Amino acid sequence: MTRVINLDGESLTLEDVIAIARQGVACRIDDSAIEAVNASRKIVDDIVSEKRVVYGVTTGFGSLCNVSISPEDTVQLQENLIRTHASGFGDPLPEDAVRAIMLIRINSLVKGYSGIRLSTIEKLLELLNKGVHPYIPEKGSLGASGDLAPLAHMVLPMLGLGKAYYKGELLSGQEALDKAGIDKISLAAKEGLALINGTTVLTAIGALATYDAIQLLKLSDLAGALSLEVHNGITSPFEENLHTIRPQSGQLATARNIRNLLEGSQNTTVATQSRVQDPYTLRCMPQIHGASKDSIAYVKSKVDIEINSVTDNPIICKDGHVISGGNFHGEPMAQSFDFLGIAISEIGNVSERRVERLVNSQLSKLPSFLVKYPGLNSGFMITQYACASLASENKVLAHPASVDSIPSCENQEDFVSMGTTAARKAFEILKNSRRIVATEIMAACQALDLKPENHELGKGTKVAYDLFRKEVNFIEHDKHIEIYDELNKASAVIEDPSFLEAVEQAVELSIQF
């Protein structure tokens, strides 16, 4: 039976977002939402017929809020809004981000506080389910008043305007509709504003980054466990008793993950008089990785709220009361996604340091740069440089966007969130850190193969090693490989959900205790 996710504005989960955005799962408007949507629309129709002054319905926008609009111009006002606000720059957002944007906007609108017609929401839903993906430039949003520019680009194809992708082909908006068998629409009063005024773009990008960060946290524990086995690491820093007296949830979870991954390993040791402690990057994984786990768990809690929230303005209350407020302001998510970027950056930082320990013969007691006949062969020498480059780039990207603001719209919108910049930066940091972690896993597997004694790996690390080696080759000599290709294979392995799923079938991994 084909899976369909119901959208009621209340129960959308991050996992649902991933299913619809990346796996193409269909969705529908839940019957429970229809009455509220229709009631909200009737209130807007009454406002227009009664010539009441309501922002964005019978007035202009932004600093033009005191300019009255006649009833006969309320429809043209909405189309003008979309045409002029579609002012984005840069490369198009990827398909999964666009689908997440469409989904989250629909889920917000079905709560029934935006005064939009049910048929208009259904049109956006039809585009999503039929795979018509608007061309949305990645840059141009201040994160308040919502994501105006990118969301206006989302709306253009609904009107037969703009550009959209359909079955991988970039077409005019009208061509995409025609090929998908979809009729264009005209907007009614309030509808343009309802579609573009909200935190949807920054939330969608940040939600995808948050989901991927959760997976990366588990992969970083795996990478660290493999590195620990290379160094015959001391296991006492992961004993539960140590962490229950400082019961930070992420710290407890990391220690448990490492214990689970290393269960049965013959490549670990205990502290002795000659070797009392391991370096921080190995010994302090629970504290370092755990801090990022706690941060990202907090961010996920904010995402869970935001994807089920109304971020429109004005709000049409069920009793007919209209409130002009600021739910479109992205500050809560801007700060959250800045926090996300910092947390992911630290994962990349510590992983890069472990890569250095693996390739450094003085620290690993293995051949320099993890290759036979170093000198003739350079092995992983420049691979570590590349990781250092990504880690250093992350340190620049981790500077918070939310501490910046530029007044706009004749100083009416005088403090903005820069939340979309924060979300985009967090995703870039995520991609960089994921490459570093993939490199650590690749280097650790290479190091394990170079060790003179081939001891049994841990319960979880053995599964990971075996799967990894099916795709990524041992590097015998420089002349036989192009390491760039192997690095790309390594990244592809860890980005494939089946890799982590297989490890988690063998051992339990979590980000919270």
Curated annotation (Swiss-Prot):
Entry's Gene Ontology molecular function annotations: histidine ammonia-lyase activity
Record organism: Streptococcus pyogenes serotype M18 (strain MGAS8232)
Name of one Pfam family that matches: Lyase_aromatic
S-S pairs: none
UniProt entry keywords in alphabetical sequence: Cytoplasm, Histidine metabolism, Lyase
Name of this chain's protein: Histidine ammonia-lyase
Gene name linked to the record: hutH
Family membership noted in the UniProt record: Belongs to the PAL/histidase family.
Coiled-coil stretches: none
Pathway: Amino-acid degradation; L-histidine degradation into L-glutamate; N-formimidoyl-L-glutamate from L-histidine: step 1/3
Crosslink position(s): 5-imidazolinone (Ala-Gly): A144-G146
One GO-annotated biological process of the protein: L-histidine catabolic process to glutamate and formate
